[in-house]
């Protein structure tokens, strides 16, 4: 198997932007003394048979040169690793080629902007370079096992005893305290209607105690392996604001495939603290209203398999059900009992209606883009000109 490890890494153009509310959970400061990426790459040096690493460098266009220089400094400090760096410069060439292949269906669906589009850019780069398996890893994670790649590719591309193909699988992460479970210490009215911890932990405990490979209701985007038979046929959704990893599970099920869980494949997750929570909550509001609208639309398409809340219990079923009234309640109480009063109050007053409008206007957008995806992948596969661009030989 010719696998590659794909790592999206998020950078700010300056210190002021690093902690500003924005599209991504965190962005590394340009002058950070101990950047997450350096720690992640250092952990990969111990891995046996580590393949090519593709770094997707996400940053403002105006900061591309400075960020590229900083990232290359970090990469040069790990000479035993084979790293292909993809900045806005290389990504724009791939996006241009995608637009030529599918002029009516691409837009920014394959780019370094937006979680789903960034994942698609990783898949596009893998296709250009001829890799038949992609292992996604996040830059705020560290690998804790020298057999990481052996575990990553275990059973991938094979079948279960029932003859079901294992084309996508997820591992899981340990937090700072060494636990694979979601913390249950956040209680009180601010979390009363907006917590998935109990349902998630119930599912996770069962998965951890079962066979090594089991059918999954969960995806850890920072530890996810995809075979080419999946990623050349099913794209990530570039229209979802966050949660593109779990959404990929829904997409796979729509097309009649399963995602699998490997309870022996792990990393350690060490995310930086988030300074503001209301922007992330707003993204989640958009996410869940859009998800419900998209799945409802897809359920009416004859050629697709309906994805229902009942089939995703105990988690994440409730989040795609009609229980989304929890959004308004949560926004209201957080506007009263947190320091981010203005942010949550704006969500309560306007954000929910805006999210509903977005969901209604885009319920068919993913399937429209997805119809072009197999052709995009076929045309990109081992593209000689793009290969020379990515490998710096053009």
Predicted ranges, named:
Residues 131-145:
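Short beta-strand-to-loop acidic/aromatic patch adjacent to the donor-nucleotide binding site
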Residues 68-125, 129:
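Active-site-proximal specificity loops/subdomain of glycosyltransferases
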Residues 144-168:
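Conserved donor-nucleotide/metal-binding helix-loop-beta segment in metal-dependent transferases, i.e.
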Residues 163-187:
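Short beta-strand-to-loop element that shapes/binds the nucleotide-sugar donor at the catalytic cleft/hinge
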Residues 205-225:
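A recurrent flexible, glycine/aromatic-enriched loop bordering the glycosyltransferase active site
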Residues 1-49, 54-66, 392:
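N-proximal low-complexity "stem/linker" segments adjacent to membrane-targeting elements
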Residues 283-394:
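Terminal low-complexity segments of carbohydrate-biosynthetic enzymes
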Residues 241-248:
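Acidic donor-binding loop at a coil-to-helix junction in glycosyltransferase catalytic cores
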């Amino acid at each position: 198997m010719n696998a590659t490890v794909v790592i999206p890494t998020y950078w700010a153009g300056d210190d002021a932007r690093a902690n500003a509310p924005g599209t991504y959970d965190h962005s590394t400061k340009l002058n950070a003394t101990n950047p997450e990426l350096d720690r992640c790459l250092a952990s990969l040096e111990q891995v046996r048979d580590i393949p090519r690493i593709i770094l997707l460098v996400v940053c403002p266009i105006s900061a591309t040169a400075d960020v590229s220089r900083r990232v290359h400094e970090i990469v040069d400090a790990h000479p035993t690793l084979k790293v292909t760096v993809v900045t806005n410069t290389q990504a724009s060439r791939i996006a241009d080629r995608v637009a030529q292949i599918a002029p009516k269906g691409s837009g920014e669906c394959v780019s370094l902007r937006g979680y789903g589009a960034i994942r698609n850019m990783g898949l596009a780069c893998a296709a250009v370079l001829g890799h038949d398996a992609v292992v996604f890893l996040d830059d705020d994670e560290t690998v804790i096992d020298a057999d990481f790649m052996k575990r990553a590719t275990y059973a991938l591309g094979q079948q279960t005893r029932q003859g079901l193909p294992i084309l996508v699988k997820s591992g899981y992460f340990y937090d700072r305290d060494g636990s694979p479970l979601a913390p249950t210490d956040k209680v009180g009215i601010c979390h009363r209607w907006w917590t998935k911890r109990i349902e998630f932990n119930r599912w996770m405990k069962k998965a951890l105690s079962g066979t090594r490979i089991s059918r999954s209701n969960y995806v850890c985007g920072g530890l996810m392996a995809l075979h080419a038979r999946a990623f050349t046929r099913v794209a990530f959704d570039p229209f979802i604001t966050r949660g593109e990893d779990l959404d990929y599970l829904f997409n796979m099920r729509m097309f009649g495939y399963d995602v699998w869980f490997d309870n022996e494949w792990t990393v350690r997750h060490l995310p930086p603290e988030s300074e503001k929570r209301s922007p992330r909550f707003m993204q989640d509001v958009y996410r869940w209203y859009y998800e419900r609208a998209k799945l409802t639309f897809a359920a009416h398409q004859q050629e697709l398999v309906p994805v229902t809340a009942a089939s995703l219990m105990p988690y994440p079923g409730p989040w795609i059900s009609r229980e989304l009234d929890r959004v308004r309640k949560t926004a209201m109480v957080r506007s009263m009992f947190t320091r981010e009063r203005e942010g949550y109050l704006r969500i309560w007053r306007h954000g929910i209606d805006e999210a509903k409008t977005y969901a209604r206007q885009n319920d068919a957008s993913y399937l429209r883009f997805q119809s072009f995806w197999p052709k995009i992948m076929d045309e990109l596969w081992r593209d000689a000109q793009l290969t020379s661009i990515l490998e710096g030989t053009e």
